[in-house]
């Protein structure tokens, strides 16, 4: 759940203008409309807009939003989405700045790092198409981040004011595309989750280095490995949809065929997950932990 997009945009902008379409604390469901063409399908549930900014700097314009989904006042899913319009404005300088923000940031970026599980990138000239999948120590990243610029005071204030709880461990994905051959727009998107929404097992190790989800450790924890494999498949499929949404040029697309399952596999995996959840509910009902009414309501929620 690293807020890398907010950090990247701080690299460019200092003058804030009126926020765009969505307002802080607005609740959104089903779709998030960044513009007429970019309409992001949201995972099920009610999403709260936490950050909403429109910024301008010497002819460069950007939109940035962060959204969260809560369960019992705990963040279980997080999305950041941003668009920057750069066409015709100081192109050489902007190209270099974007390159440095994505590939030369010493804290996070589109390059191999020990804590990153998967990095897929196309890079040629000023063009890049990037997917990063990783895990994180959420509370450390939030309260004591390695990058001193990672402040996001508005988000911290919102969490504090609303007494929101954070997960200890998060799985995340980062998606970015920029090309002068594609209208000079830079799109950035990131997702973060509490692994429990994928029925992930308990975590005994929290730090990035010791986490069961670290690529050097995960083979020792088959249940965590299964959860990460689900997340990799979901993230790869989301990147494919991201490429379609913003009309990425064909030769710039990433080859994610080995990461993204077919629709039939996704359907089978989903069916297996539903069966597992219903079996767990049935055990709770048999053991007297749930009443019949509670069991039926919970089962209906899963099936819907």
What is the predicted function of each stretch?
Residues 1-4, 304:
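Positively charged n-region of N-terminal signal peptides that target proteins for export
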Residues 4-13:
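Sec-dependent N-terminal signal peptides
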Residues 15-19:
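Sec/Tat signal peptide C-region and signal peptidase I cleavage site
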Residues 20-119:
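N-terminal Sec/ER secretory leader and immediately downstream segment
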Residues 85-261:
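Mature extracytoplasmic/lumenal regions of exported proteins
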Residues 263-292, 296-304:
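N-terminal J-domain/J-like co-chaperone modules of DnaJ/Hsp40 proteins
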